[in-house]
Amino acid sequence: MDANLRKTLDELPAEPGCYLMKDRRGAVVYVGKASSLRSRVRSYFDASRGDDRAFVALLDELLGDVEVIVTRSEKEAVLLENELIKRHRPRFNIRLRDDKDFIVLRLDERHAFPRLEVRRAREPRRAGARYFGPYSSASSIRETLRVVNRHFQLRTCTDHVFEHRKRPCILYQIKRCPAPCVYDVPEAEYRQSVEDAIEFLEGRETELVERLHGRMDEAADALRFEDAARLRDQLQAVERSLEKQRVLMADRADRDVVGLYREGPDLVVQVLAMRAGKLQDSRSYPFHEQEFPDEETLSSFLSLYYEQNAAPEEILVPVEPAEVDALADVLSERRGRRVRLLTPQRGAKADLLEVAARNAEQGFRSWHEKDERREQALAALTRALHLARPPRWMECYDISTFQGALAVGSGVSFRDGEPDKACYRRYKVKGVAGQDDFAMLYEVVSRRLRRALGEGAFPDLLVIDGGKGQLNAALAAAKDLGVPTKPSPGNEGAPFVELVGLAKSRLVDAPALGTTRVIGRRGRGGGASRAASGAAALADAAEAQEHGFVSELARSPERVFLPGRKDPVVLRQNSAELFLLARLRDEAHRFAITFHRKLRRERNFQSVLEEISGIGEGRKRALLRHFGALRRVKEATLDEISQVDGFGPKQARAVFEFFHPPRREGAEGAAVVGPPSAAAAPPIETAAVAEAVSEEDIDAALAAEDEDAEGPAPVE
């Protein structure tokens, strides 16, 4: 062992804190925490133990230094470890990507007529609201909402629509909503539906089934057969749903069960989410190069995982995590109530841990199979594109603009075939006027490579969204900055980055692909074939079918352009390597167009606010910072607008009344009360059918949350 390292170990304090292990180049490779830094760090090098654990031999090979940070308590060390892992991204630490996948349903009981909203599990909890879930996918939450909307008939419209609607939507007519937005629905009656929905979502089936049975019999005895039929349908829906769920624990507690399976340095952590004693969800988290003990790995995982997800009252773990008491304190503080970390050795809870362990092993097998397929795809891509090395770190760049205005660029990053969103970048094009995609790409790629030169880290492959012209613009940027685009002979260690262009497939006439042409009026003039694409090609196809001609429209293949090569490479259709490249390109396009639309909304936001008197540039910016989108300003209450910096009662009222003009008195604007008769019922707004909570609503709600989450992505 190095003398300086030995001296550092001899001087370690016996106090709580964090330690940073560094390699011989000074890079942090592992971050840990301990109640006693001296005992924990020295335990890795205790020769008397005859320690043959893999990570001990690994430390002998690469460790260059150990830095320690003393904290006032073990709890503070847990929190600091999280921050250090995020900052340094050490090679041997657990790192969780921002998990947006968990979804919950929120019901705000403070509202007289509450509704169910789709929210992300990671967002702060609202006081006075109930949360149901988590759900891991839109499809699982969609089925739940379908049953609730059909049989418990809660409103689905936003608060803004609810407060300003004058006529009921079509959901009222199809008996999916009592229309409390328009009619004088008794709050007690609506509250009963809310309580039924809550019991259904919480899995309290015994109480719900008994009450529905009683109300159904009561309605039948009173000859209210329509009500009895509705209650019968509710009862059947509840019973069908409950048939799919099995109670695993009689205590009906909320708990997470954590399983762990390891083979060498690779491991999978499995989390089974149980709510009200039933299995709600199961998720696998695979990790490479986890050489350190399971106790430390599990402690880091739990701290990071429950930073993104709400902790239940009880967490079952296969081994006791390092600094378990401090970790439990941190999780309890985040939850606002006590969280217990248990390692049961026998009984029903130990059986649950065994189930989680088996799921972790199955997740490990599936992950390794997927890993092998990804390695095969990278190897095939390397061969097909004649790359100097497998493209483990790929980036793709795209431009989005509308007639040259608000031009932006995007850069997305994939590592080992998976998105690495921490490395995504957005670019505002600054030095190009008008519609010049080549110049815009030149600017964006130049800025990216300039940053790479400063950091000393280059991707293995840059993919440019476009054809030969776009690729040449990117190559020119690399050349002007002196960045090599192929390995230097005799200097294998020198950095370089390879570039390719990926051109989208196009809808073309079959002659372009060497087959029969489209025959229509446009193609009969002199028998000459023409290249058709987009709307023109579709028009030809429709015309040909109308006149009985055979249409041979086809799609050109995706083409990959390589530097110094005239003809593009055409990858095998439906191959894994083509799918990987197309997925990377499509993600760059999505990221670019999302940013472009955001800038357009901001511009529209500014132009709309121009019409409000007394709102200057400073207050416009304050509104935009506070609400983020014009839609949210429109939906905000007067009190919420008053909380924006720089807004007094006068300015807040001006903004609120601009979007919510006071309703005029009169027949048209008068409130409608009482159950409507067939003759007196207001017209149904059939266009409002979209207000039902459907797949599109869920996807839109989650897209809005994703857009908000991507907002902090660096803009260069």
Swiss-Prot record:
InterPro entries named among the record's database cross-references: DisA/LigA_HHH, GIY-YIG_endonuc, GIY-YIG_endonuc_sf, GIY-YIG_UvrC_Cho, Hlx-hairpin-Hlx_DNA-bd_motif, RuvA_2-like, UVR_dom, UVR_dom_sf
Positions of the UVR domain: 206-241
Subcellular location(s) of the protein: Cytoplasm
GO terms for MF: DNA binding; excinuclease ABC activity
Keyword DNA repair: yes
Xref: SUPFAM superfamilies: C-terminal UvrC-binding domain of UvrB, GIY-YIG endonuclease, RuvA domain 2-like
All residue ranges annotated as the GIY-YIG domain in the record: 14-94
Function (record text): The UvrABC repair system catalyzes the recognition and processing of DNA lesions. UvrC both incises the 5' and 3' sides of the lesion. The N-terminal half is responsible for the 3' incision and the C-terminal half is responsible for the 5' incision.
Family that this chain belongs to: Belongs to the UvrC family.
Protein name, as recorded: UvrABC system protein C
Organism of this sequence: Anaeromyxobacter sp. (strain Fw109-5)
Taxonomic path: Bacteria, Pseudomonadati, Myxococcota, Myxococcia, Myxococcales
Name of encoding gene: uvrC
